[in-house]
């Protein structure tokens, strides 16, 4: 190899250039690192791949090839191993097969969905993705189904009638000719298709490497940016320069329209790989499958047509299918603004799935119809839920929201929805979804094109860019005119200055007098513009908008207080239909951004779960903020498990409440588009309805309140003493994450079964007020008591014997789950989906967790350590709502 002949200095210098990825100087022989090919079995590859003898800068970071002992080439995508069946570098395609699905489908050890990174891979048009639903209800009948020991009953039908009766799902890629729609799935055909694999196309701009090769350079990568390395001197100097498009090249590329799938003549803000400068980052197109699609918040929208300033889109999963698997509501409006805005004719069609009542229970209503999924237990509403036209239907809408498992809002054409209202049938509903909705380009693109420029995106300013030929746009002025009339122009200018001088005094006086008026007008215009924007955002939220006067009226001038918290006061209220509501009036919000409040309420409004408190409306009027949500007559769990409670709940009821809270937290962590971490789970934030069904409340409110200080003190730390996770206090225990909610849940469960004693906590608090003790005394109590004989007594303590075997099993299960959840290290705690599985599963499957090693933390260091732990936490996939919760002294 080349490196044997290199001097030590050259080797070190070249390695330095490899690892730092900078324009570098190295040995000319160093180019051999990228000239060598990757070879394994019958696979040979060069740029843009790397691996083996080809070092990392020689290829794209995501295209590392591996060769195992059997000479099989593999590639890892999102930690999933794929075998490389074939590489065709002429067409830039690969054939891949998942290594875990090469054998018997039922014996696979993992069933995970691996998403192909769209920035580098594009599924070939001759292949498609299918969803496999598993752990389905064996009592129901499914199309294209099979039963495996590990999967239970599973189905591959793409128009599943009972999609919500299956607990899990994952996707596989198969040829478009594969149709699993028969009654019983032919597993042999499926296994054969998976073994053959699927084809993907590499999404890499070929021009930079072609230009580099024309200069006898070596193609390489500086991170994800293509570079070209060339020898600069006979003595061996090498220079690696990142590729940059010239201004003329950008203008040429962006002034031309492009095609994607079946769509032609596409332009800004849409773009595809190779045209990054020509479109907005949020509008990258996926051209696989023969369609032009954009992905917003994990939801695909298909481009139906585009003409200059208008673009028509439709939800891809709803085209031709009213019952897609696991549909989501995409908060795409925030992504589109300010590049695109909805046209005035667009309405939001809301679809409800998995409802617990029949259509006969819904009174006749022109705005509400039957969807036709889930054996008829699914419905649609043809108007924005905030529309005044639906005021007379609030009772029906409340039932839909509370008794349906999922609701999805889909933009649709107003005229199409009007046709659906006048002639409600499945064909018109499909037509309304298939026709999509229109959006208007709001940027300066039309002006740019009119001046001869090409529309694009300026990476430096992160905004709209107008690219011009030779750097000039607009009309060219005729300099000859000025030469011919130079004397006349000079005279005109001289007399103009004289006239201006005479008027200067008068102008100054008028300006002084008019400035205050101008300031008022500008302020009013700006305020009007902001209000219009807020009104547009409000209109997109499927909740009732209340004025402050209406809030005051429904609460009878805020007379009946039902609760107080760190964010505001809760009042009971009554709507016009006599239904009871709870109204939380947030603390003074002067100086805060109303748009932030609207965006947060929008996120909160998209949660829909039986164990999550339902939001009914909101008020955003100046600095006044209020949240209106369902009223739960039984109040909080705290009054049922506190020492002062006169009502004792049996263990079965407590178990049902604990399981419901776990399911609610699982939904917040995994069921929402963006993970929601509560950070303040405690009995006061668990509300109970008339049937003692628990509902988690007060999530998302902290971000809606003003942050008073830049550095949080101990009393400003998220959570409540006694429930707060150790890592929230000190980084010694790990990073802050969704596992902090798991800890709080564990403490809640232990309190519910009486494993926590208020007097013990009070003693610890009084013994050393300057320190925070985590409850290791729980284990001491459990050592004294026999776990298998736990019983909840009247005062919440632990005694032995005298309980039924069923209650004994419940107590043991809740104790073990609680102890697993309060492990001091976040990595030792189970995630909430595992907690639900443990609570629902067999007691025999649970092991006694290890006793955590807990340390005494000085309160004086809490503030600094808290911030350190937060900064180190992985927050990229977490929407941290509780940013300013008060650390309250709870009565435990």
Curated annotation (Swiss-Prot):
Pfam families documented for this protein: GUB_WAK_bind, PK_Tyr_Ser-Thr, WAK_assoc
Highest taxon in the source lineage: Eukaryota
GO cellular component, one term: membrane
Main EC class the enzyme belongs to: transferase
Keyword field: ATP-binding, Glycoprotein, Kinase, Membrane, Nucleotide-binding, Phosphoprotein, Receptor, Serine/threonine-protein kinase, Signal, Transferase, Transmembrane, Transmembrane helix
Signal sequence residues: 1-27
Glycosylation sites: 42, 71, 88, 112, 186, 222, 230, 286, 358, 384, 407, 458
Active site: 680 (proton acceptor)
Modified residues (Phosphotyrosine): 629
Extracellular side: 28-496
Membrane topology type: Single-pass type I membrane protein
UniProt subcellular location: Membrane
Occurrences of domain Protein kinase (ranges): 556-854
Modified sites of kind Phosphothreonine: 547, 717, 720
Gene3D superfamilies assigned: Phosphorylase Kinase, domain 1, Transferase(Phosphotransferase) domain 1
Membrane-spanning residues: 497-517
Membrane side Cytoplasmic: residue ranges: 518-892
Keyword Transmembrane helix: yes
EC code: 2.7.11.1
Family according to the record: Belongs to the protein kinase superfamily. Ser/Thr protein kinase family.
Keyword Electron transport: no
Record InterPro entries: Kinase-like_dom_sf, LRK10/LRL21-25-like, Prot_kinase_dom, Protein_kinase_ATP_BS, Ser-Thr/Tyr_kinase_cat_dom, Ser/Thr_kinase_AS, WAK_assoc_C, WAK_GUB
Catalysed reactions, as listed in the record: L-seryl-[protein] + ATP = O-phospho-L-seryl-[protein] + ADP + H(+); L-threonyl-[protein] + ATP = O-phospho-L-threonyl-[protein] + ADP + H(+)
Binding positions (ATP): 562-570, 584
Protein name per its UniProtKB record: LEAF RUST 10 DISEASE-RESISTANCE LOCUS RECEPTOR-LIKE PROTEIN KINASE-like 2.8
């Amino acid at each position: 190899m080349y490196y044997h002949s290199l001097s030590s200095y050259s080797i070190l210098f070249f390695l330095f250039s490899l690892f730092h990825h900078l324009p570098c100087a190295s040995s000319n022989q160093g180019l051999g690192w990228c000239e060598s090919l990757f070879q394994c079995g019958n696979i040979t590859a060069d740029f843009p791949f790397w691996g083996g003898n080809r070092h990392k800068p020689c290829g794209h970071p995501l295209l590392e090839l591996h060769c195992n002992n059997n000479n099989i080439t593999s590639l890892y995508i999102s930690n999933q191993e794929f075998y490389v069946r074939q590489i065709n570098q002429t067409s830039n395609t690969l054939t891949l097969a998942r290594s875990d699905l090469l054998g018997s489908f039922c014996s696979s050890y993992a069933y995970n969905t691996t998403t192909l990174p769209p920035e580098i891979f594009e599924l070939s048009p001759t292949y498609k993705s299918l969803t496999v639903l598993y752990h389905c209800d064996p009592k129901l009948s499914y199309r294209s189904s099979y039963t495996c020991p590990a999967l239970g009953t599973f189905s591959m039908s793409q128009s599943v009638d009972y999609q919500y009766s299956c607990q899990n799902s994952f996707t596989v890629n198969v040829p478009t000719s594969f149709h699993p729609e028969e009654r019983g799935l032919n597993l042999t055909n499926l296994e054969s298709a998976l073994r053959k694999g699927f084809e993907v196309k590499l999404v890499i701009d070929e021009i930079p490497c072609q230009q580099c090769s024309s200069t006898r350079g070596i193609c390489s990568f500086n991170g994800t940016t293509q570079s070209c390395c060339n020898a600069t001197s006979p003595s061996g100097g090498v220079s690696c320069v990142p590729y940059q498009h010239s201004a003329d090249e950008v203008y040429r590329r962006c002034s031309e329209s492009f095609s994607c799938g079946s769509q032609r003549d596409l332009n800004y803000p849409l773009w595809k790989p190779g045209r990054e400068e020509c479109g907005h980052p949020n509008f990258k197109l996926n051209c696989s499958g023969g369609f032009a699609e954009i992905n917003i918040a994990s939801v695909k929208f298909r481009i139906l047509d585009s003409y200059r300033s208008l673009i028509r889109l439709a939800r891809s999963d709803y085209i031709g299918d009213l019952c897609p698997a696991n549909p989501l509501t995409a908060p795409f409006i925030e992504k589109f603004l300010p590049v695109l805005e909805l046209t005035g004719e667009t309405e939001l069609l809301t679809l409800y799935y998995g409802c617990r009542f029949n259509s006969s229970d819904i009174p006749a209503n022109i705005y509400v119809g039957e969807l036709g999924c889930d054996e008829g237990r699914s419905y649609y509403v043809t108007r924005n839920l905030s529309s005044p036209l639906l005021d007379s239907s609030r009772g029906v809408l409340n039932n839909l929201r509370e008794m349906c498992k999922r609701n999805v809002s889909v933009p649709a054409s107003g005229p199409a929805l009007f046709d659906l209202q006048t002639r409600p049938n499945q064909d018109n509903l499909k037509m309304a979804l298939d026709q999509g909705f229109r959006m208007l380009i709001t940027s300066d693109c039309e002006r740019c094109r009119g001046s001869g420029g090409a529309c694009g995106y300026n990476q430096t300013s992160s905004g709209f860019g107008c690219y011009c030929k030779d750097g000039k746009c607009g009309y060219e002025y005729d300099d000859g005119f000025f030469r011919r009339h130079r004397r006349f122009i000079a005279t005109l200018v001289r007399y103009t200055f004289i006239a201006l001088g005479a008027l200067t005094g008068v102008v100054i006086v008028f300006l002084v007098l008019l400035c205050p008026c101008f300031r008022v007008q500008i302020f009013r215009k700006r305020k009007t513009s902001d209000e219009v924007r807020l009104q547009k955002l409000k209109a997109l939220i499927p909740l009732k908008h209340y004025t402050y006067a209406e809030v005051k009226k429904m609460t009878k001038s805020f007379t009946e207080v039902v609760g107080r918290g760190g964010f505001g006061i809760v009042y009971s209220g009554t709507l016009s239909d006599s239904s009871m509501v709870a109204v939380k009036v947030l603390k003074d919000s002067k100086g805060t951004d109303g748009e932030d409040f609207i965006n947060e309420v929008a996120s909160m409004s998209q949660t829909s779960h039986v164990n999550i408190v339902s939001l009914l409306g909101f008020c955003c009027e100046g600095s006044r903020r209020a949240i209106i949500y369902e009223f739960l007559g039984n109040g909080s769990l705290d009054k049922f498990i506190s020492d002062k409670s006169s009502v004792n709940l049996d263990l079965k009821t407590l178990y049902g409440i604990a399981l419901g809270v776990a399911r609610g937290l699982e939904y917040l962590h995994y069921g929402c588009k963006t993970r929601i971490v509560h950070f303040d789970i405690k009995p006061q934030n668990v509300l109970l309805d008339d049937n003692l069904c628990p509902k988690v409340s007060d999530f998302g409110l902290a971000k809606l309140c003003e942050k008073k200080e830049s550095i949080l003190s101990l009393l400003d730390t998220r959570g409540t003493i006694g429930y707060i996770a150790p890592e929230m206090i000190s980084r010694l225990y790990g990073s802050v994450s969704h596992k902090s909610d798991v800890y709080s849940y564990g403490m809640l469960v232990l309190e519910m079964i009486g494993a926590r004693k208020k007097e013990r906590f009070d003693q610890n608090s009084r013994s050393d007020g300057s320190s925070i003790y985590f409850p290791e005394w729980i284990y001491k109590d459990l050592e004294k008591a026999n776990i298998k004989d736990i019983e909840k007594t009247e005062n919440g303590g632990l005694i032995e014997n005298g309980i039924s075997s069923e209650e004994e099993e419940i107590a043991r299960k809740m104790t073990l789950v609680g102890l697993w959840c309060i492990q001091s290290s976040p990595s030792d705690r189970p995630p909430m989906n595992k907690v639900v599985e443990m609570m629902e599963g067999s007691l025999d499957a649970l092991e006694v967790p290890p006793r955590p090693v807990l340390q005494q933390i000085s309160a004086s260091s809490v503030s600094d350590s808290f911030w350190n732990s937060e900064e180190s936490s992985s927050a990229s996939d977490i929407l941290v709502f509780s940013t300013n919760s008060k650390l309250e002294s709870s009565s435990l």
